[in-house]
């Protein structure tokens, strides 16, 4: 189903803004800007080459993005070893690393230009609200492994920083349109130019699709039909401005909004309306001695409304078993107990100061401090009409010591404090040894913590008749809930061969997670006799191997391959009363993940791509196993010059073969055809 709702006032503002800012600007070539493309900063907040970082890093650069057969951002993470990208619903995706991939994966930090998009209300990332497409991305830094010493609790398993294209990299107008089956309709218009001394890039985008096709087929031995109302309709506006008042200083301002309507649910679907907005300010200075200062501050606001079927008290009584309790409750007057609309608001304010110094006695360092305030409001999730807020702070420091020409040591720590709680500290140590030119071994140790989120530590979800009568207890947080713990070690290798044409990355890892937050069941005096308690219930151990390789013998040819093997042991404390029950969930993560991308660009600017992705079987405790899949995506794209501007037409075919299952049996990913057109205008 496709939902149609466009904010006319916002749309009018955006169109007016485009017309007012249409001025010419000089073009700076991409080669001028990407000289330091292989420098990464997400691991230590210092620019480092890949052979000096204390953790494994994957860079998805512009060339790889263009070569891929990806249609949206989610597809790109199939190119990263150990990363699993999946769909809970057609427009409700999830991404996780190695383990713990549920409907709301919440142990992965995701940033856009350094601004966290991790939302407090569901303790996860709402990918629908990101408001970016492949054309907006310059490159992506992915830290594979716990990155809490750099990014805090959200980066418990890994972290992602999506870096968008600078306003200096384009000039003038550009339109992009996509059409495809499942009623895919995506249209965008962007403008890069100058407002006084400010270089800017501004984008207006509208996207819609009908989601997965309705399910009709055999399930559990019988013919089943399910209507999937999981379409989406989204309008996005984004502005990025860059001002350089001096040779030392640069100031960047970003703001935008996203209006979405998305169908979500487990067989029974509801309509979720999302209004999302953000503001992001960054100031940086490069001093003459090579040291730097940086200050960044941002605000995210996530406002949602779930439209669902209302429920009256007498309707709820139909779910109660016959007996004296039901007869007694039937004497009470009828009333509405579940509203047809559930509203929730999540806000985050975050400010961080960061500084670096270089090469003092062969030591470089980065250090900083930050303040954060999270505020949420949801009567359904917190059983109160007032807002719930949490203040937190963090301090960090990272050091790189060049011990010799061949040996580098890295160490770093971060301490987080929240209202009324003890501080938790995460640290990492690593040594990198250069075996030979372009061949480096890395030995690393990581000790990280993930503090409970605002939802995890304060959830209280009940269905009430009134203040004194609870009909159903759903979820409540345990009063003694505390931080999750990760202890990991790794042996890594980075290297290059054939004059830097072939780049290799391998990682052997052991990751032990304890006090993992999930839900246990206990007896409760309500209609079903059960209450879910959010508590430290699970323990997870992951051991395995992952590698990636990219071969670029020329500017026309690219091969990218990756593979991961994860041996997972997952124990869950499922029920505490009346009898304790432990469940083995070791099969809920695929043991094998991998992908292969091959791209060739002819002399006539015809780009041909094939992308193969594989995921092995997932074994669910219920026995409803996901058999895994091997999926082939192909793309052909033709580029040319039109009146001195770039133009491109492309056809992408995803899953060239039989349908496969995405997460639930009724989510069948069929062959998808997407035709796109990009045109640069004067």
Predicted regions span which residues?
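Gram-negative outer-membrane beta-barrel transporters
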Residues: 366, 402-408, 421, 509-512, ...
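C-terminal beta-signal and adjacent terminal beta-strands/loops
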Residues: 216, 514, 519, 614-619, ...
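Membrane-embedded beta-barrel scaffold of Gram-negative outer-membrane proteins
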Residues: 294-308, 374, 434, 442, ...
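Periplasmic-side early beta-strands and strand-to-turn transitions of outer-membrane beta-barrels
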Residues: 148, 161, 168-171, 176-178, ...
């Amino acid at each position: 189903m496709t939902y149609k709702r466009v904010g006319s006032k916002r749309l009018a503002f955006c169109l007016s803004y485009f017309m007012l800012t249409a001025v010419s600007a000089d073009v700076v070539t991409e080669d001028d800007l990407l000289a330091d493309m292989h420098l990464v900063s997400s691991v230590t907040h210092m620019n480092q080459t890949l052979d000096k970082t204390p953790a494994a890093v994957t860079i998805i650069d512009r060339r790889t993005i263009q070569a891929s057969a990806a249609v949206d951002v989610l597809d790109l993470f199939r190119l990263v070893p150990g990363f699993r990208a999946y769909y809970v619903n057609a427009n409700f995706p999830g991404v996780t690393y190695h383990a713990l991939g549920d409907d709301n994966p919440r142990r992965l930090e995701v940033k856009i230009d350094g601004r966290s998009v991790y939302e407090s209300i569901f303790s996860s990332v709402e990918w629908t609200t990101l408001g970016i497409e492949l054309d907006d991305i310059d490159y992506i830094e992915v830290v594979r492994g716990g990155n809490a010493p750099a990014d805090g609790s959200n980066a418990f398993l890994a972290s992602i920083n999506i870096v968008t294209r600078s306003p200096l990299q384009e000039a003038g107008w550009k339109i992009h349109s996509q059409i495809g089956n499942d009623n895919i309709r995506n249209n965008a218009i962007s403008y890069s130019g100058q407002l006084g001394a400010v270089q800017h890039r501004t984008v207006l985008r509208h996207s819609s699709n009908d989601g997965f096709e309705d399910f009709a087929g055999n399930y559990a031995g019988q013919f089943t039909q399910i209507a999937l109302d999981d379409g989406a309709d989204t309008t996005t506006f984004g502005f990025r401005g860059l001002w350089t008042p001096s040779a030392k200083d640069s100031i960047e301002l970003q703001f935008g909004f996203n209006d979405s309507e998305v169908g979500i649910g487990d067989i029974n679907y509801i309509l979720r309306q999302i209004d999302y907005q953000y503001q992001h300010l960054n100031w940086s200075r490069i001093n003459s001695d090579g040291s730097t200062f940086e200050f960044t501050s941002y605000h995210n606001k996530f406002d949602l409304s779930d439209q669902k079927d209302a429920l009256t008290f007498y309707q709820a009584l139909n779910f109660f078993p016959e007996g004296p309790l039901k007869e007694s409750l039937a004497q009470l007057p009828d009333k509405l107990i579940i509203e047809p609309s559930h509203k929730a608001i999540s806000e985050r304010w975050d400010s961080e100061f960061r500084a670096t110094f270089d090469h003092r006695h062969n030591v470089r360092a980065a250090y900083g401090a930050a303040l954060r305030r999270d505020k949420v409001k949801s009567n359904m999730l917190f059983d109160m009409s007032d807002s719930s807020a949490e203040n937190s702070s963090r301090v960090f420091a990272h050091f790189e010591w060049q011990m010799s020409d061949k040996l580098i040591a890295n160490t770093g720590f971060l301490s987080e404090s929240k209202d009324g709680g003890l501080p938790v500290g995460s640290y990492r140590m690593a040594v990198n040894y250069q075996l030979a030119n372009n061949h480096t071994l890395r030995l690393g140790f990581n000790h990280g913590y993930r503090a409970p989120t605002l939802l995890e530590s304060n959830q209280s979800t009940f269905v009430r008749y009134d203040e004194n009568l609870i009909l159903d207890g759903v979820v409540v947080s345990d009063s003694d809930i505390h931080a999750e713990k990760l202890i990991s070690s790794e042996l890594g290798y980075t290297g290059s061969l054939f004059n830097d044409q072939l780049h290799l990355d391998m990682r052997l890892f052991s990751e032990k997670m304890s006090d993992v937050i999930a839900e246990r069941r206990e007896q409760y005096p309500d209609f079903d006799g059960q209450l879910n308690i959010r508590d430290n219930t699970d323990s997870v151990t992951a051991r395995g191997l992952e590698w990636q390789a990219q071969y670029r013998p020329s500017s026309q040819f690219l091969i990218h391959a990756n593979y991961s093997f994860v041996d997972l042991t997952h124990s869950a404390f499922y029920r505490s009363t009346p009898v304790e029950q432990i469940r083995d969930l070791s099969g809920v993560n695929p043991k094998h993940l991998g992908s292969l991308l091959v791209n060739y660009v002819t002399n006539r600017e015809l780009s041909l791509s094939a992308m193969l992705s594989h995921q092995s079987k997932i074994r669910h405790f219920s026995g409803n196993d996901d058999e895994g899949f091997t999926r082939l995506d192909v793309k052909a794209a033709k580029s040319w010059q039109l009146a001195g501007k770039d133009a491109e037409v492309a056809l992408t075919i995803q899953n060239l073969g039989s349908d496969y299952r995405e997460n639930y049996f009724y989510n069948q990913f069929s062959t998808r055809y997407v035709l796109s057109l990009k045109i640069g205008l004067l």
